[in-house]
Amino acid sequence: MKKKILVSRLYPKEGIRLLEKENFHLTLWEEKRPMTQVELIEKAKSHHALLCTLTEKIDSHFLTQCSHLEIISQFAVGYDNIDIDAATGFGIPVGFTPDAMSEATADIAFGLMIAVARKMFFLHKTIINGRWGYFNPTGNLGFELKDKTLGIFGLGRIGVKMAKRCKN
């Protein structure tokens, strides 16, 4: 019998393919909204495992209704939404992906840094509102990041990745 996994969100296709390759039966929630807890409980009742995100509340109420689950794992760095003590009490192991979003988060931070330095948000709004007028080289360029010092608060996974992007 194939093990059934409830996937509560649209996940990267590579991950879905890996699970399908291992012969799991996947039920994918494809709506562009999170499941309500009632929907989550009803769907999880017929599955062996749950693959979720931070928006699903996995509390003692959920776990009491779905104590048959063999594992819960979530695509997120943290797991504040999961009652670990209750899951442990039901003998359900919980997994998470501590480095899943580090590269993307560092990329976004890097992009935001450039966008702010070069006034991209302001200039985008100016263009959208039809107020572009003329190009002002001294007023519209913002400032160069070259030879600037970057302060990074914390050198965890994301801070280190950001530092490597900004090195030299």
Predicted feature locations:
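Glycine-rich Rossmann-fold phosphate-binding loop(s) that bind the pyrophosphate
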Residues: 155-156
